């Protein structure tokens, strides 16, 4: 075992011992022995392949025991996650100290230099880079915010214990503090009593920025400065550089969420302004206290007059103005808006004055001071601006159609919803070019229509830098885009807000190119976009609609087609990737995903959603956040400067055929098998999931619908809970079998090695199959499903075995993910702790369905859901 792995195991053992002590103190040594016995039975069951003794022990638990037992395994898995997350920090620091850390940006620059790229070309690529990470609060984060804070504190204590030459007294102090925090966590309810509000979710997103990203961003820039200085004469990059920025959907995503209203969105924009001002005030205060220097250049002297402390003079002015900005935002939040005079409307004034101080320090021989915390604040200002994040607004296309229908009916023009596409476009373009208002003066819209119109009015009253894109869910025609343009115009929005169609189903992905081409043929629209087009690619719903393999190929083809189209029209395309945390929703390592995009489709710009629990895993700790930013930056630069070769035509033909076969097989089960819906509802906790207060958005689009109305997140969550992982692989077994039987085995292996797109797909499939456990899924079935439905379960498990064997054959592996020992080991270590939660959950589902009012059973059931999600390290 490496020293690195030994460190991880030691931390897991330490945290586990602290948890055991907390449980023993609370519930007695006998309870701890019972939990340990269950763990040993689980471990033995894994080794022997027979979990009968474990199942018997869990079934014997009475209703009063099940909650603490479920909590014990849930909390241990959360502590394991903390240890693993900190281990990534430990490993990086160890490698840096040994001089063996591979910085992804530095490695890329070395490769580019060897390929004759100049420093100027590389810096130019970085300067033109536009990466926007969009934080979203889909209902995937199962851990309570109060527990997240405790987990962050645990990580800090592990860091303190990791220091070389720590004194025994200090070590004792930090271990005592660990025990205290873990005991606090044990005595804290894991399950919220109420769902978080959209504002709660937004505050959590802002907290990630405050506690991690605000520190990570300047550190990331210092790494960039260091890496680029090896190839450039300059020792730092331009001060206004901002290759990565942040946006959010928290408080702006109203698609299917009636809790997100125009008032909520306005409140979130003001909260963002307040938080940004608060962060700047803290840093300005520190700078003002430190910057006692008296010598300055002529430019700064001209600004401050004969002040004896020129730097403090400027910083005091900035701090006071930022305080006024914070007070203005607070007054607006309290419903007592002030005039808003003498506040920061944008960040330019702040950065201009900070750069004035910076240049003065350089001119006066104080370079070491200039390049300290002042430079860090300049970098933060360039990245976060005056608003911290830009807020996207998302709404379903049908809501705009409903609003326009109400207006046309009022005027006696007929029903807009019933018009064909040509009639809709003609009406919209006439109104867009009209000088008279569209909205009737004496008209009372329905509450739903009024909310849509109020949202546009709210945008018009806000500032441009508070908003990102207006995303249209389920976009399927040019009129969907023009409708939003008309609403923006009618509401008096004084800036060209980006209007972004989101293509979600396979059919809409296939139609994306002709839809955008029609828009480009409209002079008004082409003038509006001013040479830049953004399109969002939906991963979740396309996979749910057609199966993962068909959806993945459909997404690739749509991006290719849009890239060609925009190049033909001289339009700069930004693709917005709506990826989730799981494979079934397009998840996976970001750098791998970016490098597997079609050649030319990245072109220096990309937007990506960072969803739910993945935000914490990728950005929750500054060290890990820096690494994540490095990976994004290097991947976008590589994809832009040295894109992969286009796939061979024969590879495309194979993918076309496999995607068709996969889609037909997937749909024949999901839509065509008469037992599918009753089987799904009986064997998974899909119905019970609605009880878990995961997020502010309802799990279903409609309360009366079947699988098609279920959102992609709970759809995947439900299958993951029983370890069948069906959305990520169903259809792939038939597709890959077809490829092999057509005599293309060696070509498929060649595609895996030489085509980044197919390589990424097969490797992600390999990983998710390694997390599947057909024996566990079978137990759920035996405990919960009638014999008349069990034939479908046997069919599905047979297909799971088939696809697993095919992946191993294609990759020449004896075992799944044999080529990724880190993930393989993580899964193997976790399984003995997750297994009891699965078997317990199946038993709880059985009890709950017999007695829905049993509070202890229902609480334990929700704890098992949270624990399994934590153990699997992803939810939906």
Swiss-Prot record:
What EC number(s) does the entry state? 4.1.1.31
Q: Tell me the keywords, alphabetical order.
A: Carbon dioxide fixation, Lyase, Magnesium
Catalytic activity as recorded in UniProt: oxaloacetate + phosphate = phosphoenolpyruvate + hydrogencarbonate
Organism of derivation? Marinomonas sp. (strain MWYL1)
Mind telling me what this protein is named?
Answer: Phosphoenolpyruvate carboxylase
UniProt function note: Forms oxaloacetate, a four-carbon dicarboxylic acid source for the tricarboxylic acid cycle.
Q: Which GO terms describe its cellular component?
A: cytosol
One GO biological process term is: carbon fixation
């Amino acid at each position: 075992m490496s020293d690195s792995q030994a460190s991880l195991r030691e931390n897991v053992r330490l945290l586990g011992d602290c948890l055991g002590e907390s449980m023993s103190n609370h519930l007695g040594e006998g309870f701890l022995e019972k939990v340990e016995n269950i763990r040993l039975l689980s471990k033995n069951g894994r080794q022997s392949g027979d979990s009968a003794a474990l199942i018997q022990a869990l079934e014997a638990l009475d209703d009063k025991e099940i909650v603490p037992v479920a909590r014990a395994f849930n909390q241990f898995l959360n502590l394991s996650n903390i240890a693993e997350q900190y281990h990534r920090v430990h490993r990086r620091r160890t490698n840096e100290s040994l001089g063996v850390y591979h910085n992804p940006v530095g490695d890329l620059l070395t490769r580019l230099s060897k390929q004759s790229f100049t420093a100027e070309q590389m810096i130019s690529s970085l300067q033109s880079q536009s990466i926007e990470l969009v934080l979203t609060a889909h209902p995937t984060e199962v851990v309570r915010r109060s527990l997240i804070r405790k987990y962050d504190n645990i990580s800090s204590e592990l860091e303190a214990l990791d220091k070389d030459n720590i004194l025994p007294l200090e070590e004792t102090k930090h271990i005592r503090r660990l025990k205290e925090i873990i005991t606090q966590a044990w005595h804290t309810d894991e399950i919220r009593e109420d769902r978080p509000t959209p504002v709660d979710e937004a505050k959590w997103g802002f907290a990630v920025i405050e506690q991690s990203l605000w520190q990570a961003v300047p550190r990331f820039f210092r790494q960039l400065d260091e890496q680029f200085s090896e190839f450039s004469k300059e020792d730092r990059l331009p001060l206004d550089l901002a290759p990565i920025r942040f946006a959010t959907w928290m408080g702006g995503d109203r698609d299917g969420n009636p809790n997100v209203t125009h008032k909520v969105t306005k409140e979130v924009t003001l909260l963002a302004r307040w938080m940004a001002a608060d962060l700047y005030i803290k840093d300005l205060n520190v700078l003002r206290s430190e910057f006692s220097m008296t010598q300055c250049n002529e430019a700064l002297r001209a600004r401050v007059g004969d002040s004896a402390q020129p730097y403090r003079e400027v910083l005091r002015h900035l701090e006071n103005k930022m305080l006024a900005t914070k007070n203005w935002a607070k007054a607006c939040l309290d419903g007592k808006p002030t005039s808003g005079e003498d506040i920061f409307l944008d960040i330019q004034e702040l950065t201009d004055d900070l750069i004035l101080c910076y240049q003065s320090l350089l001119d006066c021989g104080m370079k070491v001071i200039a390049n300290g915390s002042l430079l860090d604040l300049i970098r933060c200002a360039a990245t976060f601006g005056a608003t911290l994040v830009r807020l996207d607004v998302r709404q379903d296309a049908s809501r705009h159609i409903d609003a326009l229908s109400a207006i046309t009916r009022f005027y006696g023009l007929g029903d807009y919803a019933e018009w064909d596409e040509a009639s809709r476009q003609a009406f919209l373009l006439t109104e867009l070019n009209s000088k008279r208002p569209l909205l009737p003066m004496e008209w009372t819209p329905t509450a739903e229509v009024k909310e849509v119109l109020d949202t546009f009015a709210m945008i018009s009253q806000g500032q441009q830098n508070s908003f990102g894109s207006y995303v249209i869910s389920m976009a399927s025609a040019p009129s969907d885009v023009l409708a939003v343009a008309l609403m923006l115009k009618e509401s008096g929005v004084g800036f060209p807000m980006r209007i972004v169609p989101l293509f979600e189903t396979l059919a809409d992905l296939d139609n994306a190119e002709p839809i955008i081409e029609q828009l480009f043929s409209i002079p008004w629209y082409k003038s509006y976009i001013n040479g830049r087009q953004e399109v969002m690619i939906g991963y979740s719903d396309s996979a749910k609609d057609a199966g993962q393999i068909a959806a993945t190929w459909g997404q690739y083809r749509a991006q290719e087609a849009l890239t060609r189209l925009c190049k033909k029209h001289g339009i700069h395309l930004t693709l917005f990737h709506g990826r989730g945390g799981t494979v079934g929703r397009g998840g996976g390592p970001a750098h791998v995903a970016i490098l597997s995009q079609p050649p030319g489709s990245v072109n220096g710009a990309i937007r990506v959603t960072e969803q739910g629990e993945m935000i914490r895993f990728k950005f929750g700790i500054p060290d890990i956040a820096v690494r994540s930013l490095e990976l994004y930056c290097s991947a976008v630069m590589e994809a832009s400067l040295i894109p992969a070769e286009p796939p061979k035509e024969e590879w495309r033909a194979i993918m076309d055929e496999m995607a068709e076969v996969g889609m037909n097989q997937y749909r024949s089960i999901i839509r065509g098998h008469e037992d599918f819906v009753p089987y799904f509802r009986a064997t998974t906790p899909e119905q019970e999931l609605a009880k878990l207060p995961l997020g502010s958005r309802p799990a279903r689009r409609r309360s009366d619908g079947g699988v098609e109305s279920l959102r992609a997140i709970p759809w995947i969550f439900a299958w993951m809970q029983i370890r069948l992982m069906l959305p990520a692989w169903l259809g792939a077994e038939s597709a890959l079998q077809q490829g092999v039987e057509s005599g293309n085995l060696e070509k498929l292996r060649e595609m895996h090695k030489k085509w980044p797109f197919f390589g990424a797909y097969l490797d992600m499939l390999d990983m998710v199959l390694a997390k599947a456990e057909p024996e566990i899924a079978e137990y759920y079935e035996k405990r919960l499903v009638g014999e008349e439905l069990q034939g479908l379960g046997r069919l599905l498990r047979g297909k799971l075995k088939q696809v697993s064997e095919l992946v191993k054959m294609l990759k020449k592996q004896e075992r799944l993910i044999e080529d990724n020992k880190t993930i393989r080991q993580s899964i193997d270590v976790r399984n003995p702790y997750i297994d009891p939660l699965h078997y317990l959950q199946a038993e709880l589902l059985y009890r709950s369905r017999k007695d829905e009012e049993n509070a202890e059973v229902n609480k334990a059931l929700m704890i098992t859901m949270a624990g399994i999600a934590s153990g699997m390290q992803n939810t939906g």
